[in-house]
Amino acid sequence: MAGYLRPLLAVLMLFCASPGITAEAQKDPLDSFMWERYRERFLGDTPVRFDQRVRVQAPAFAEDSGQVPIDVDASAFNGRFQRMLLWVELNPIPLVFDYRPLSDGLANLSINVRLEQSSAVRVAVLSDGVWHVGGTRIEGEGGGCTTPGIAKTEDNWSRDFGKIMARRFDHEPGSRVRVKLSHPMDSGLIPSTRPFYVEQVAFIRDGEPAATMAWQASVSENPELALTLKGDSDASYRFQARDNNGNEFDHAIP
């Protein structure tokens, strides 16, 4: 009898370990009623699993709903992932970015986002045909997407528009770049305003894109991004961006 059970047990163990079925088998750790909607919208039919290796950190309560820092650490997938998505489930524009690591991008970054109301925040990392999902919940008074920011209320906003500040630091296994771009990042959700936001970001090495991001208007005004790249201190990077009005920005990272 034992001889017949061994093959059956082996098949059952393989089936239970398969990442393709864990999305349905696992309970949503954030217990969000919007999870299934955005799983289908952003992740499609690709297998999905909740994974503690995708670590998402944010303040438990957002004191400034227009500037909420999100830290993502999925270093376990460094060199073995093809895309990363970040979305805020209850924002009117839920998707924040679509990150493609290409040759140099690593799965460790931070960015400031808008928060319209208390919400679950998700990060999905595509690795070897499976979406690995982590997340957290942020409470807040909200209004970050529909309240005017300060960028255009200051007299000097047009003077500073497009100004870039960038630095690079040693950070194993490569280097950490920090970039701040002066831009209003208007969502178009405020009456009498049109969408005006950065939509494409790239880190350039040796004249070629080394990592890229597609942004949405849920990124905070005067966006700040920190990203770990493979290149060490000898690598030469440029930061390039383009907004939806065709303005282009270019800056060498020292």
Model-derived regions: residue spans:
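Short amphipathic, basic-aromatic surface patches that mediate peripheral association
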Residues: 74, 180-193
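Short acidic/polar inter-strand loop motif in beta-rich domains
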Residues: 127-135, 242-251
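Ligand-binding face of N-terminal immunoglobulin V-set domains in extracellular IgSF glycoproteins
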Residues: 107-112, 120-124
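N-terminal edge beta-strand
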Residues: 38-67, 154-172
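Surface-exposed, short loops/turns at beta-strand junctions within beta-sandwich domains
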Residues: 112-118, 228-235
